[in-house]
């Protein structure tokens, strides 16, 4: 069952439960008071409520749902004599995406054998380690904690510039909110990422949530940094809204390539490191950038530079429509090396050869040889091993009385 069908089934079942539960709740006199969820980001969410009923309560469970991942868990609760309950969700062990919506409800089993399902409640898993300031424009929300009002306005300007840049590649979808969170240091941002993230990570997006997180330190370079990093992450959100839940099937080189093209002020070192790698025959094969980028900072930067240049080549050759068609094929599950064949009628390896030749001025023979090198090695093995056998047999045939060589044991 695919993700869309699973989510729809989940919604239908949940709606059915709530409708039936409201009728049962009214009949049984179950009441919930002081329902709260206290978030301690990176540590826990504490769910508390006081539950009372006209019929004695046999047991209570809490149903917690992570909407962004369509995951749920059902946990039994202890009910105190005064009806109080609490449950601590350890967010160090249970992975929650930053700023995701968490919903919860209560299932109350009564002594008469009936079960009552409460209404659902919701809390946002906000990074409350900081006191956020907020500036809004329509569905665009900019949040920061280090810097004055001018800093926030500069960030909002960067969002709008980034959307204008993105609109040259695809239609914008601003129907749902976009929340941009600006962190003052890489360490602060890494505190939001599941595994801490690499040291060089300066931005992250949760496209399904419409959440963008970037590192920008207040100072003379803040506007340039904003117009590099914010548009980059915004493109991830727009691409997700364009292709839907198949977004994660898109190769890393195309996701990051389109994101770097959206940067208003792209990093000037992209071209330098790309030219150096091309001259030294140190380019990363594009097929090696399908699943993910390298963890090493230097190699990762080269991966970004290559992806930007290769994606720009595709855009210049096939236009925005061609690029979006390619993304759509990938989102539908087409394999990395087959997607370009479906969209353009050309293999990924041949497109790479053309890109290296026309954009980087590299001899087309080198990448072609690199692509077929494993097959050449295999061919040599297939030919050489029988040849060695034939030579050995002819030598033995020419000297029939010569004894075989052996090593005497001492």
Residue ranges of predicted features:
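Acidic/His/Gly-enriched intrinsically disordered linker/tail segments
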Residues: 199-212, 224-229, 234-237, 241-372, ...
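Bacterial N-terminal signal peptides
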Residues: 10-18
